[in-house]
Every structure is written in structure tokens, then in C-alpha cells.
């Protein structure tokens, strides 16, 4: 089973986590849309209740550029990674989003880069073929 919609982590209870544990889950997706919501205790509780141990099967949609700053977006991404979740950045109004937000999306959603380069500050999206890419 693959839950592709972003479930509300706050609604996970021991009972429905037990039900999830009884089915074969390909991937479960949660959402952390509002940076003002402190969802860390809920994500920790799910880890305790769930038998899903592979971080790639615990994905969290992170909504960026919708009343959030770059720092808030980066905080949620780094926090989720530290907790053992796989963040996936979604940008509201992408064509008008700040360049740094689009770079963060490219960094986070390209898993080869994300798991190879430990920090966003070390990621240089303009670096092409050993030379800085001119725009």
C-alpha cells in the first residue's frame, strides 16, 4: 500500500499505527505545511509506534514559499532528516519563488545530491563540469 497523500501526523494514534503495522506499506507520506506548527513530538511518536524502519518509506511533504522563510524551510528539512524521515520539498507559486527556495527544492528532491552533500550550504547548484556555470 502506498499513501501518496500527505497524512496529518497529529492524527496518528497507537490504534491507527497498529493498523498501519498490519498492512504492507510501500511508502507513507505526511505533510508539514505550516512552519509555525511544532510537529517534532508527533514525528517522534510515529517512529516509536511504527514498524516502518526504512527512512525512504517515511516521506514528508514540506510546503515552502507559503508564508515561510528560507530559514524555516531549511529547518524543517534538516529536522526531518535528523529524525529519520525523507523530506520532499514542494514550492507554492514556484515561478515567483525566490531563487534560494528553488535551489533548496533541487537539493532536497534530488536524493543522490541530498544524501551525498550533507548540508545545503555546501550545495552549489551553479557548479557545472568543474567550473562555475555562467547564467
Residue ranges and their predicted role:
Residues 1-46, 55-66, 86-90:
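Core AdoMet radical
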Residues 51, 63-135:
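Auxiliary Fe-S-binding modules of radical SAM enzymes
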Amino acid at each position: 500500500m502506498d499513501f501518496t497523500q500527505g497524512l496529518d501526523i497529529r492524527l496518528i494514534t497507537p490504534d491507527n499505527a497498529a493498523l498501519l503495522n498490519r498492512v504492507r506499506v510501500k511508502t507513507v507520506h505526511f505533510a508539514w505545511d505550516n512552519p509555525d506548527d511544532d510537529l517534532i513530538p508527533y514525528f517522534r511518536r510515529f517512529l516509536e509506534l511504527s514498524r516502518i524502519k526504512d527512512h525512504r518509506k517515511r516521506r514528508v511533504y514540506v510546503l515552502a514559499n507559503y508564508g515561510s522563510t528560507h530559514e524555516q524551510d531549511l529547518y524543517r528539512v534538516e529536522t526531518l532528516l535528523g529524525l529519520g524521515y525523507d523530506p520532499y520539498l514542494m514550492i507554492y507559486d514556484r515561478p515567483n519563488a525566490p531563487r534560494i527556495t528553488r535551489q533548496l527544492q533541487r537539493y532536497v528532491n534530488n536524493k543522490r545530491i541530498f544524501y551525498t552533500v550533507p548540508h545545503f550550504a555546501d550545495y552549489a547548484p551553479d557548479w557545472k563540469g568543474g567550473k562555475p556555470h555562467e547564467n
